[in-house]
Regions:
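Short, low-hydrophobicity acidic/polar segments
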Residues: 26-158, 220, 301
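Contiguous ligand/interfacial binding patches
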Residues: 163-219
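Solvent-exposed serine/threonine-rich low-complexity stretches and specific carbohydrate-binding patches
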Residues: 69-83, 169-179, 213, 245-251, ...
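C-terminal motif of bacterial Sec signal peptides marking the signal peptidase cleavage site
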Residues: 15-17
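Sec-dependent signal peptide recognition
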Residues: 2-8
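Short, solvent-exposed S/T- and G/P-enriched segments that are highly enriched in secreted/extracellular
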Residues: 84-89, 170-185, 254-257, 367-372, ...
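Short Pro-Gly-centered beta-turn/loop motif in secreted/extracellular proteins
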Residues: 85-100, 182-194, 257-268, 373-383
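Insoluble glucan recognition modules
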Residues: 19-45, 51-56, 143-144, 148-150, ...
Length: 438
């Protein structure tokens, strides 16, 4: 992708009058404890609201005055004015020849890593300006230029959410972005390295192995893309037979996927690659409609029930390893959903475990009568499922494949023919054990 940039107008502080230095001016003596009132006009109006490539001051803006990195005062935008700043500075022990530094924002020394989204602009106070001037020139009305110390990343996101850009080891997050709207992220030009991004939990579809910026430039990243997974949502989002699966995106989590803004009418399932393969056909056990912000236990089997939900628009998360689907109000994190309470204690025991058959591994309760566990098996390892850690209630199967029927309580050992890491699913009431490679 070509790199496009435009220059941001620098903020120039102009005084109303200029005073010429008299070459016979006597040597100045600093006055201990001296403070003085400064009133300046910043022309043209500059800085915090982006309008094309021009920027303007906004209510509440303040410029900090520093001497040798120590704050000596603040000049604040006068209420009702567009360019007049006033305030007291501590000029004790300072000479007119001493240089002071003006910084905007007054109390910010680094580009903030969390910035609130502003449509067509960037967060108030996120772009830094800095310039130096002799104290005598500031008093006399000589000009000072504030240089833009930040770079801007221009972007649009395909879905609503928080957009986080990582450059090297530093991450800048723009919160509350709407879909298909132009935003700007402020970044420190000193930061460089690999560029990647996320939207919510979804991984960005493009990366740059090496990325750097310069102050006072805008870098147009264009319309961001997201990394599509092999999984999708299919069902009463339209016509089961004719409508294409709604793509789920890969996320920062292992085997964890998300589809944003899915409009659902009644039921749906999650499947892989747009085909009905029993290894990757995820449904649940109950036809009862779920409400928003619910967690649904799922397992992979052609005979599973559709995931029914109250009609609406949702962000749908799929945790394949835990056997769970989250049905969330758009914008809500899946973490706010309440996890289901397990009605019992289920565990795996078998020859896969170094501790032997009496050493058990707990299974996670997914919800809706389903338990799961991710386990490494060697070829021909065997296992059974124990209830409450007792061999009095243990379940096995003569053959383990998607939708295998359980033999019975105290049935035969389930054998895994090929070595690998597997997701074990157990649906007791439906007499099902499922085994699918991770």
């Amino acid at each position: 992708m070509k790199k496009y940039f435009v220059y941001i107008a620098s903020a120039v502080l102009m005084m109303a009058a200029c005073a010429k230095e008299d070459i016979n001016t006597p040597v100045e003596t600093p006055v201990v404890g001296e403070t003085e009132f400064i009133s300046i006009e910043l022309n043209p109006a500059t800085r915090t609201i982006l309008d094309g490539t021009n920027t303007n001051w906004s209510a509440g803006d303040a410029v900090g005055v520093y001497f040798k990195n120590e704050s000596i005062g603040t000049l604040t935008l006068v209420e009702g004015s567009t360019n007049k700043f006033e305030g007291e500075i501590e000029s004790a022990l300072l000479l007119g020849q001493d240089k002071v530094t003006l910084k905007y924002p007054a109390d910010v020394t680094a580009v903030p890593t969390t910035q609130v989204a502003v449509a067509g602009s960037f967060a108030n106070g996120a772009a830094l300006l800095e310039g130096s001037v002799r104290l005598k020139d500031l008093r006399a009305g000589e000009g000072v230029t504030l240089n833009n110390e930040t770079a801007l990343l221009q972007f649009k996101t395909p879905v609503a959410g928080d957009v986080a850009f990582t450059i090297g080891t530093t991450t800048y997050t723009v919160t509350g972005c709407a879909a298909n709207t132009t935003y700007y992220a402020c970044v420190d030009p000193a930061v460089s390295g690999k560029l990647s991004y996320t939207v919510g939990l979804a991984l960005g579809g493009k990366e740059k192995a090496s990325f750097s910026t310069e102050a006072n430039k805008v870098y147009d990243l264009g319309a961001l893309t997201l990394k599509e997974s092999m999984f999708g949502v299919i069902g009463n989002t339209g016509d089961w037979g004719d409508k294409a699966d709604i793509k789920m995106y890969e996320t920062t989590g292992d085997n964890f996927y998300v589809a944003y803004g899915v409009e659902v009418t009644s039921g749906f399932k999650v499947r892989k690659a747009g085909v009905w393969d029993n290894n990757y056909n995820f449904g649940t056990t109950s036809a009862t409609a779920k409400s928003a912000n619910s967690v649904v236990g799922v397992y992979t089997d052609g005979g599973s029930t559709d995931i029914n939900v109250t009609n609406g628009t949702y962000d749908i998360y799929f945790d394949r390893l835990a056997g769970q689907v989250y049905i969330m109000t758009p914008g809500n994190s899946h973490k706010v959903a309440t996890q289901p309470t397990a009605p019992g204690n289920y565990s795996l025991a078998g020859s896969f475990n170094g501790g032997g058959w009496d050493d058990t591994v707990a299974m996670k309760y997914s919800g809706d009568g389903i338990w799961t566990n991710v386990q490494n098996f060697a070829a021909n390892n065997e296992f059974k499922i124990k209830i409450k850690g007792s061999w009095n209630s243990s379940w096995g199967a003569d053959n383990v494949s998607p939708g295998s029927e359980l033999v019975s309580n105290s049935g035969g050992n389930a054998k895994v023919k090929a070595a690998g890491t597997y997701i074990v699913g157990f649906y007791k009431d439906g007499n099902k054990i499922t085994l699918v490679k991770k």
